[in-house]
Swiss-Prot record:
Name by which UniProt lists this protein: Probable S-methyl-5'-thioinosine phosphorylase
Keyword Glycosyltransferase: yes
Subunit structure: Homotrimer.
Function as written in the Swiss-Prot or TrEMBL entry: Catalyzes the reversible phosphorylation of S-methyl-5'-thioinosine (MTI) to hypoxanthine and 5-methylthioribose-1-phosphate. Involved in the breakdown of S-methyl-5'-thioadenosine (MTA), a major by-product of polyamine biosynthesis. Catabolism of (MTA) occurs via deamination to MTI and phosphorolysis to hypoxanthine.
Protein family: Belongs to the PNP/MTAP phosphorylase family. MTAP subfamily.
Keywords carried by this UniProt record: Glycosyltransferase, Purine salvage, Transferase
Site (Important for substrate specificity): 156, 209
CDD domains: MTAP_SsMTAPII_like_MTIP (cd09010)
Binding site for substrate: 173, 197-199
Any GO CC annotation of this UniProt entry: cytosol
Organism: Methanocaldococcus jannaschii (strain ATCC 43067 / DSM 2661 / JAL-1 / JCM 10045 / NBRC 100440) (Methanococcus jannaschii)
Reaction catalysis annotation: S-methyl-5'-thioinosine + phosphate = 5-(methylsulfanyl)-alpha-D-ribose 1-phosphate + hypoxanthine
Length: 252
């Protein structure tokens, strides 16, 4: 089973349009299930996009996907660019992350047992290679590097960006803690970032939501093509590090 975390536009390519609510011990998650293609679409911000990044119930979302039998997750994340050569309209495939969040529930192991999950390769290496091959096949421009996750919902200041650009390549608000929670449940996770704007201080203008939404709309068909190719890839048995992530991570 494949999980897609993204927006309502992706529902167009699924065979199934009935929204379902999945109850978990961490809360509820809203999904659309395409049983024919074994795909689950999860709306990160809610069906009406009314949940801000810092209020998303990340644990309920990831746990719901696990409960439904999802093994591989493709997450769609909108980001701002920290580098001039990573232009709005390009894609970005993270290979690492740095996070500056403050209030998020970020682990499934607050009690019961102590788990130190390895984050040497936080994004599934197998899925990253597959995603890059799909982007290459479609001749879609993309970059690779470090995703910086901030708390939101505000945009970052110029001084913050001046620091972040020394450490990372793009900045966003939704990529963490999804990536860690997925690894804790031994699921494969990869992120397809769509670059919507230059970050504050990189851009010569003030940042607006209209600018972001306009670029998302402009990239929508490309995003849908990548998602469709990912769904139809024809995955075999998992041979990556993700499936055994807890093997050497649990104390006691």
């Amino acid at each position: 089973m494949i999980g897609i975390i993204g927006g309502t536009g992706i529902a167009e390519i699924l065979k199934g349009d009935k929204e379902e609510i999945i109850n978990t011990k961490y809360g509820k998650a809203r999904v659309i299930i395409d049983k024919e293609n074994e795909v689950v679409l999860l709306f990160r911000h809610g069906v009406r996009h009314n949940i801000p990044p810092h209020k998303i119930n990340y644990r309920a979302n990831i746990y719901a996907l696990k409960k439904l039998g999802v093994e591989r997750i493709l997450a769609i994340n909108s980001v701002g660019s920290l580098k001039e050569d990573l232009k709005p309209g390009m894609f970005f495939v993270p290979n690492d992350f740095i996070e500056f969040t403050k209030k998020r529930e970020e682990t499934f192991y607050d009690e019961g047992k102590v788990v130190h999950i390895d984050m040497t390769d936080p994004y599934c290496p197998e899925l990253r290679n597959i995603l890059k091959s799909i982007l290459d096949k479609n001749n879609f421009s993309y970059g690779e590097g470090v995703y910086v996750c901030t708390e939101g919902p505000r945009f970052e200041t110029k001084k913050e960006i001046a620091i972040y650009k020394n450490w990372g390549d793009v900045v966003g608000m939704t990529g963490y803690p999804e990536v860690v929670l997925a690894r804790e449940l031994e699921m494969c996770y990869v992120s397809l970032c769509n670059i919507t704007n230059y970050a504050c201080g990189i851009s010569k203008n003030i940042l607006t939501v209209d600018e972001v939404l306009e670029k998302i709309k402009e990239m929508e068909n490309k995003i849908l093509k990548v998602v469709e190719d990912f769904i139809n890839y024809g995955f075999g048995e998992r041979k990556c590090i993700c499936k055994d992530a807890l093997k050497h991570a649990v104390i006691g």
